[in-house]
Every structure is written in structure tokens, then in C-alpha cells.
UniProtKB/Swiss-Prot annotation:
PROSITE patterns: GUANYLATE_KINASE_1, GUANYLATE_KINASE_2. SUPFAM superfamilies: P-loop containing nucleoside triphosphate hydrolases. Residues 5-183 form the Guanylate kinase-like domain. Its EC number is 2.7.4.8. This is Guanylate kinase. ATP binds at G12, P13, S14, G15, A16, G17, K18, S19. Belongs to the guanylate kinase family. One of its GO terms (cellular component) is cytosol. NCBIfam families: guanyl_kin. Pfam families: Guanylate_kin. It comes from Helicobacter pylori (strain J99 / ATCC 700824) (Campylobacter pylori J99).
Amino acid sequence: MNNDFNLLILSGPSGAGKSTLTKYLQEKIPKTHFSLSTTTRKPREGEVDGLHYNFVSEEEFKQGIEKGQFLEWAIVHNHYYGTSKIPVEKALKEGKIVIFDIDVQGHEILKKHYPNACSVFISTKNQEILKERLLLRGTDSKETIEKRLINAYKEMQCLESFDYLIINEDLEKSKEIILSIAKTLVHRLKAFNFEKICKAWKNESL
């Protein structure tokens, strides 16, 4: 199978539920690899370096850019975010499903690298619900939340570039949907080697 058919990109506004759904997929599908993003922002309360993100200084991040260590990178809310190349390529060679939790900018760049990747946009029903979730999370200032809401509106204008949309109103239902999508990845027809399959069906007596 072609490796890039095992890529699942999750995008959407902060607070829509991407992290929760990613964690669920990792619990339900043993052979997965979560692509840990590298960022220059400070850890939120409860976040662990190397578990939730790779936290680095701006200088370290820029050095990584110069060395070509990132598949994609972008500046979001005045912080650098990027996807490291080596762990992703290693996981693909091992036949794992690689899951990305990245923004819309990152999605566009990754699709250029991996055109067969499957992408899912995850959102709340409307802006008011997203604002409520961000306020309840209690990790951002009011100013930061306003910036996130403005950015979320901009991201919603890019929906047509994604393969699937999940309006995350009912978490259990959203879990079922994302699991179904992930399980179908390796069974898409374009992922198969047709020549190999046809050879297996060859009948010398015909």
C-alpha cells in the first residue's frame, strides 16, 4: 500500500474537541502514531513536554526551519507551530496510521506533501458554543479567546478543502464517526496495489 493513505489530519478551532477525539482514536486503534507538534508557546496548565507538545524556544524552532526538519510550520497567535518530518516518515514505514492535530494552514501544506491523506474538520455548531467552551477551559485570557474566535471564523471559510466535517455537539456520536473514518483509511481502493492483487488471481489454466 502507498504510505500516505495512512494519514489522518484533524483540524478545527481550538476548543472544538480535536484533542479528545485524537486520544479516543489512540485508545481504540493500537497501531497509530500521533504526530506531536513542536511549538514555541508556553505550556498550559497540565501540559507535559514530549506528551502534549514538544516545547522549544523560538531560536531552536528557527534552527529547525533552517535544517529542513519540519514538514510544515506556521505562525499562529504569535507562536510558531510545526510538524517534525522524521517521526512521521518512520511511523509510515512501520505501517502505522499517523494522526495530525494541526491548523488549517498546516493542513494545506501537508496535503501538498501527502495528497492521499484524509482530512477531517472538527467544529462546534456555532461561535457562541465555542466561546463557552474556551471560557470553561479557563486557560486563555479574554483577549486570547477573542483572537481564537476571529481565527475560527476564518478557518470555517476553508471547509471545502476537507474530506469530512464533524459538528461536535454529541461527543459519543463524534467518537463513533471519527473511529469509522479512521478504520476505512487502509481500505480505500486507491490505497491498494492493483497489479499485485490481479497477479494473485491469475489462473494459468484459463
